[in-house]
Amino acid sequence: MKIIKRNGTTVNFDASKIYNAMHKEANSVYVVSEDLDSNLKRIARTIEAQLLKNGIDAITVSMVQALVEEKLLSAGYLHIAEHYISYRLQRDIERTDYKDKVIVHLRLEQVR
């Protein structure tokens, strides 16, 4: 399976990158326990399995990020999802050259 990056290039899918991104945001919210770490690994594996089961040959980074957000929210990790979404939005703003000091504050209502 391939990932279509924002610049149009493709690379091999790597579920560990999903786990690493979730872990980074979880670590910004909590001290990551063994249980939380295991659950984040499970979520990354679930996303990979779902894509493989559906016969997806290539998927965009944005689509993977949307799946991560969905899985974090459905697993009840609202604060981690909030931080993940906020970081993603900040990076999107930076990528589009809006380098003003924009601070994105998300509330639970906005995540839903």
Tell where the protein language model's regions lie, with residue ranges.
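Extended catalytic cores of very large enzyme megasubunits
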Residues: 1-112
